[in-house]
Amino acid sequence: MKKIALLLTAFIGLTALQSCTIEEYYDENYYEGYSQVFELPNETLSTPEDAFTYSGTWNFTTPIYDSDNVLVYRWQGNSWTLVPVSYNLGGGDMIKYDYDFTRYDVKVYVSTSFPINELTNAEYNEFVYRQTFRVVVVPGGFQQKINFSDYNATISALGLENAPLKTLQLKK
C-alpha cells in the first residue's frame, strides 16, 4: 500500500510540474540595430570633482541594458581617440581622460597631475574647453572581434556607418 501511495504521489507531482514553464522575453532585433552612437558636441567639462578633476555627465535618452558596454571617443584634431587616454604635458605633468557609465548616464572626466586651475590658457582650450565626444553603445552579447581603438572600424562592425547621430544633453 505504501508503494502505491508513493507512486501515486510521484505521478501527481510529475503531472503538476509539467505545466510549469518559464517565459523569457527575447527581442529579436536586440543585436541588430540596438547599437547606438551619440555625439556630445563642443562640451566644456566644468563640474569640479576635486582640485585635480573636472567632469561632465550626460543622460541617455532611454536606459541601456545592464549587459551593454559603452565606449567613449574624443575628437583629437583629425581623428577619434578611444578614452581612457593620457597626454604628457612635459615636466612630469600629465592630463588624462576617463569615463564611467550606468544604465542611465555616462560621465567623462578630465584629470591632471597638478591642480587643474593651473592649466595654461592654451592647455585649457585644448583639453577642457569645447571638447567633442562620441559615445558608442555596444550590445553585451556582441561577439564579432572588433578593434575598439579604431572608431571607424567599431562603427562599421556595429553597422552604424549611416546611422543618424543622436545628441545627448549635458546634465546640469
Where are the language model's segments positioned?
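Intrinsically disordered, low-complexity segments enriched in polar/charged residues with Gly/Pro
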Residues: 1-2, 59
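Bacterial Sec-dependent N-terminal signal peptides
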Residues: 3-5, 14-39
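Basic side chains
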Residues: 2-3, 134
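First exposed extracellular module after export/assembly in secreted or surface-exposed proteins
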Residues: 28-172
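Active-/binding-site microenvironments in catalytic and ligand-binding cores
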Residues: 10
